[in-house]
Amino acid sequence: MVTCLTTFAVLLLTAAVASAAEAAAPGGESYVKAIFAVGAMIGAGIAIGVGAVGAGLGIGTAASGACQAVGRNPGVQGKIMMTMLVGMAMAESIAIYALVVSLVLIFANPYTKFFFVG
């Protein structure tokens, strides 16, 4: 999941450059729209990238701790596994929230009305 989200972040940054080239036409307002679109897409890429890194660190820490605990006391493997899976789900939720924020920034940006009147 983390690799998929990191790939998505790279694609968002690539799409920002393509959108800027497509939207840039002679005229002042089109440049403002292009800069706004590029800023939103770069922000979305950064959000998903940081969210994926945070999730990766959280999942790695949870798995490391669980492996050490099972190595020390193999009798409680079931309880440790359940706790580890809950912790991994919470860590992965950060990446999912970052994905939602990036999709909102790209497709349903609430700040568009402040920059474009008319």
UniProtKB/Swiss-Prot annotation:
Tagged with keyword Cytoplasm: no
Molecular function terms from GO: lipid binding; proton-transporting ATP synthase activity, rotational mechanism
Topological category with respect to the lipid bilayer: Multi-pass membrane protein
Location relative to the cell: Cell inner membrane
Main function: F(1)F(0) ATP synthase produces ATP from ADP in the presence of a proton or sodium gradient. F-type ATPases consist of two structural domains, F(1) containing the extramembraneous catalytic core and F(0) containing the membrane proton channel, linked together by a central stalk and a peripheral stalk. During catalysis, ATP synthesis in the catalytic domain of F(1) is coupled via a rotary mechanism of the central stalk subunits to proton translocation.
HAMAP family noted in UniProt: ATP_synth_c_bact (MF_01396)
NCBIfam families named among the record's database cross-references: ATP_synt_c
Protein name: ATP synthase subunit c
Organism (species): Syntrophus aciditrophicus (strain SB)
Record gene name: atpE
